[in-house]
């Protein structure tokens, strides 16, 4: 009988302290998440120093809770996986150093995991990945289209040239007057309004899979500024609908076109913005029309969590891709350089 592989995973790249135990690359035995949203809400966004402080305060308790919830001990664990980047460097270092301490104390292999690879592998938990596939990554810090021909093989075929889609959502939300985190509130409002503004769709060069959201963001900000200057009433739901329609149309079109060009029948979506109901519906509609299998994780697996890191870590474990205790956190890591040879 094949021995079960247990991975203890640690994720601290931004404002969630999360630890998970994953069995055999798919089964979540525990997935403890300590959120910091309330602490950052009064600042209107994540404050790196505050995030780091909360990680320091919560990491030990979160590790213990994950082990208890999984009903395992450190002796049962086969390897420690940890997000090494990209992310907030101070936040990353808390998780990396905690993972290194565990690896040293219990003589376990240490597995560095790319944060975006983790988001991609969140899909594998609910629906096993089949290749080739196109991955649409949409989050607060990243907007990318990635072609994968096999496990841990990443070819970035498109990326944002300026703002990430989640960043644009948060800035538009603040301009409208919505509280942090603004993305989910824009999505909720968008379901209630009408596309009365017809904000621009930014397609960039012909056949390009790159994205740009800074112009759209500026168009929304300028529109609302002009209305306020002229005392013209602002219907928040219409602003949200018009903005979201512009974003979703571009994301959907480019994702579908990439599937067609690369002869791929599987599209997966990853990152916090994958929770967006408008985007999920648009992709579902177009994938159905084009006979493409669509996978989007449950909302709880779209946001940052250690389970996704553990799943990616499992495949790195199988390839023997370990780090020594000199491992450090990195605020920026190229996904393609991280790809398996």
UniProtKB/Swiss-Prot annotation:
* Alphabetically ordered keywords of this record: Acyltransferase, Cytoplasm, Iron, Metal-binding, Transferase, tRNA processing
**NCBIfam families per UniProt:** gcp_kae1, T6A_TsaD_YgjD
| Gene symbol of the encoding locus | tsaD
| Entry's cofactor comment | Binds 1 Fe(2+) ion per subunit.
- Provide the catalytic activity annotation: L-threonylcarbamoyladenylate + adenosine(37) in tRNA = N(6)-L-threonylcarbamoyladenosine(37) in tRNA + AMP + H(+)
The yes or no answer to whether the keyword Repeat is present is no
Q: Which cofactor does it need?
A: Fe(2+)
Q: Name one GO biological process term.
A: tRNA threonylcarbamoyladenosine modification
Q: Which family does it belong to?
A: Belongs to the KAE1 / TsaD family.
Query: Under which name does UniProt file this protein?
Result: tRNA N6-adenosine threonylcarbamoyltransferase
């Amino acid at each position: 009988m094949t021995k079960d592989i247990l991975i203890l995973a640690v994720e601290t790249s931004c404002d969630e302290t999360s630890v998970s135990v994953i069995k055999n690359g798919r089964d979540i035995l525990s997935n403890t998440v300590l959120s910091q949203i309330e602490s950052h809400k009064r600042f209107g966004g994540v404050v790196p120093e505050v995030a780091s402080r909360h990680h320091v305060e919560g990491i030990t308790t979160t590790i213990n809770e994950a082990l208890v919830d999984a009903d395992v001990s450190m002796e049962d664990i086969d390897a420690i996986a940890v997000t090494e980047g990209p992310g907030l460097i101070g936040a990353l270092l808390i998780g990396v150093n905690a993972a290194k301490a565990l690896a040293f104390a219990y003589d376990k292999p240490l597995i560095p995991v790319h944060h975006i690879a983790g988001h991609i592998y969140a899909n594998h938990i609910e629906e096993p990945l089949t290749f080739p596939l196109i991955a649409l990554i949409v989050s607060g810090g990243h907007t990318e289209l990635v072609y994968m021909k096999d496990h841990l093989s990443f070819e970035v075929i498109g990326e944002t040239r300026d703002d990430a889609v989640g960043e644009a959502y948060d800035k538009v939300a603040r301009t409208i007057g919505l509280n942090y985190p603004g993305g989910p509130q824009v999505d909720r409002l968008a379901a209630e309004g009408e596309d009365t503004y017809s904000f621009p769709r930014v397609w960039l060069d012909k056949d390009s899979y790159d994205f740009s959201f800074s112009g759209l963001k500026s168009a929304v900000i300028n529109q609302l500024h002009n209305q306020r200057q002229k005392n013209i009433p602002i219907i928040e739901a219409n602003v949200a609908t018009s903005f979201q329609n512009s974003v979703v149309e571009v994301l959907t079109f480019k994702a579908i076109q990439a599937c067609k060009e690369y002869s791929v029948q599987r599209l997966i979506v990853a990152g916090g913005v994958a929770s967006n109901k408008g985007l999920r519906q648009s992709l579902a509609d177009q994938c159905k029309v084009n006979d493409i299998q669509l996978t989007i994780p449950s909302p709880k697996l779209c946001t940052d969590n250690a389970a996704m890191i553990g799943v990616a870590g499992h495949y790195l474990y199988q390839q023997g891709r370990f780090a020594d205790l000199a491992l450090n956190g990195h605020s920026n890591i190229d996904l393609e350089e991280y790809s398996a040879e």
